[in-house]
Amino acid sequence: MADKIKLEVVTPERVVANEHVDFVVAPGVEGEIGILPFHAPLITSLDIGILRYTVEGKTEKIALSGGFLEVKGNKVVVLANAAERGEEIDVERAQRALERARERLARRTPDIDVLRAELAMRRALNRLKAAGKM
């Protein structure tokens, strides 16, 4: 049996993943972070992005909305603000959120919080990517 690393992805609401995996790629704030079994200890911040991992040659995707990652021992723990597996994502809802964010950014009226609209657009695009729709 090949070496595995334990992956736990947790949000305030639920445990999204709890399994032994071959490899993890996480969206760090400075770029992607690749983690193999027996990785050196690490704590880092995560950005909005796709967490990818492989199990028995199959790649799984989880859309993250930021958070923190810790590698300790032979375990990766992701504490995420929000996380959804690709197959759980409501694609129509994500597309509507993307359209709303783009409309707000196009208007750019004084009452629009541009940063909030940009973050909403990034989250919607990320969810669509995780669902395989982009």
Curated annotation (Swiss-Prot):
Keyword Protein transport assigned: no
Membrane disposition: Peripheral membrane protein
Record flagged with keyword Coiled coil: no
Keywords of this entry: ATP synthesis, Cell membrane, CF(1), Hydrogen ion transport, Ion transport, Membrane, Transport
Localization terms from the record: Cell membrane
Superkingdom of source: Bacteria
GO cellular component: plasma membrane; proton-transporting ATP synthase complex
GO molecular function, one term: ATP binding
InterPro entries linked to this entry: ATP_F1_dsu/esu_C_sf (IPR036794), ATP_synth_F1_dsu/esu (IPR001469), ATP_synth_F1_dsu/esu_N (IPR020546), ATP_synth_F1_esu_C (IPR020547), ATPsynth_dsu/esu_N (IPR036771)
Major subcellular location class: membrane
Alphabetical list of HAMAP family matching this protein: ATP_synth_epsil_bac
Function, as annotated: Produces ATP from ADP in the presence of a proton gradient across the membrane.
Annotated family: Belongs to the ATPase epsilon chain family.
Record's subunit section: F-type ATPases have 2 components, CF(1) - the catalytic core - and CF(0) - the membrane proton channel. CF(1) has five subunits: alpha(3), beta(3), gamma(1), delta(1), epsilon(1). CF(0) has three main subunits: a, b and c.
Protein name: ATP synthase epsilon chain
The species this protein was found in: Carboxydothermus hydrogenoformans (strain ATCC BAA-161 / DSM 6008 / Z-2901)
Gene that encodes it: atpC
